[in-house]
Amino acid sequence: MKINTKSKKVNKAWFNDHIHDTYVKLAHKEGYRSRAAYKIKEIDETCGLIRPGQVVVDLGAVPGAWSQYVRRRFAPREAGVGGAAAGELNGRIIALDLLPFEPLEGVAFLQGDFCEEAVLAQLVGLLDGRAVDVVLSDMAPNLSGVEVTDAARIANLVELALEFAQSHLKPQGALVCKVFHGSGYSQLVDQFKRTFRVVKAVKPKASRDRSAETFLVGIGLKSTGMPNADAV
């Protein structure tokens, strides 16, 4: 069988980059499940989103680094390796993903497809009538490499997150959503501007330079007839 040497070189280069990555090392040291924790950390520090006592929904939660970060914001830190959160949580975290989720104390997890109405109904049930302060979406589709197809898949997930946010966020609540630069990006920004009073695009330092991902942050739901959102 012929071996694709180019593919082997790419995989080896990725592995080398990964094991020497500053954020990978930091995540291991601080007890996070992935380097993605530092993406939401920077977004939170930039925008001031997450505070004790809130209700936070984490969409596309696996492996759980974002939920871990929120949990640490909701609980005291014990002295020890990684500064892991300990004690009773002051807040509610609900995580959802298609894939299995390693249990995390204080985090309610629902496994299922956010695109399915039955799963969405279960998620709403877990809220138990409480409005949401922050919706986090790190959801991403399986990419085909066909730009038009991928743009449509990305847009669909963003639109679903927007619909959920519009229905369940508090008036001053916030949505953080992963998007990708390319076809359809400007339309997604426009949708955020129509929905939120303040819209920010944040590319965290922990997001790899070669990655097209960025994060749209919408803060404060608009009422009909309000002027266009401020954008940064």
Swiss-Prot record:
- Isomerase listed as a keyword: no
Residues that hold S-adenosyl-L-methionine according to the record: G64, W66, D97, D113, D138
Q: Which GO terms describe its molecular function?
A: rRNA (uridine-2'-O-)-methyltransferase activity
Active-site positions on this chain: K178
Q: Which residues form the signal peptide?
A: none
Q: What is its main location?
A: cytoplasm
Identify the keywords attached in UniProt to this record, alphabetized. Cytoplasm, Methyltransferase, rRNA processing, S-adenosyl-L-methionine, Transferase
InterPro entries, alphabetized: RNA_methyltr_RlmE, RNA_MeTrfase_FtsJ_dom, rRNA-MeTfrase_E, SAM-dependent_MTases_sf
The entry's localization annotation reads: Cytoplasm
Specify the domain of life of the species encoding this protein. Bacteria
Which EC main class describes this enzyme? Answer: transferase
Write down the EC number.
2.1.1.166
Q: Quick check: keyword Hydrolase in the entry?
A: no
- Any one cellular component term from GO for this entry? cytoplasm
Listed under catalytic activity are: uridine(2552) in 23S rRNA + S-adenosyl-L-methionine = 2'-O-methyluridine(2552) in 23S rRNA + S-adenosyl-L-homocysteine + H(+)
Give the family this protein belongs to, as stated in its UniProt record: Belongs to the class I-like SAM-binding methyltransferase superfamily. RNA methyltransferase RlmE family.
HAMAP family, per the entry: RNA_methyltr_E
Q: What does this protein do?
A: Specifically methylates the uridine in position 2552 of 23S rRNA at the 2'-O position of the ribose in the fully assembled 50S ribosomal subunit.
Q: What is this protein called?
A: Ribosomal RNA large subunit methyltransferase E
Name the species this protein comes from.
Answer: Leptothrix cholodnii (strain ATCC 51168 / LMG 8142 / SP-6)
Report the gene name: rlmE
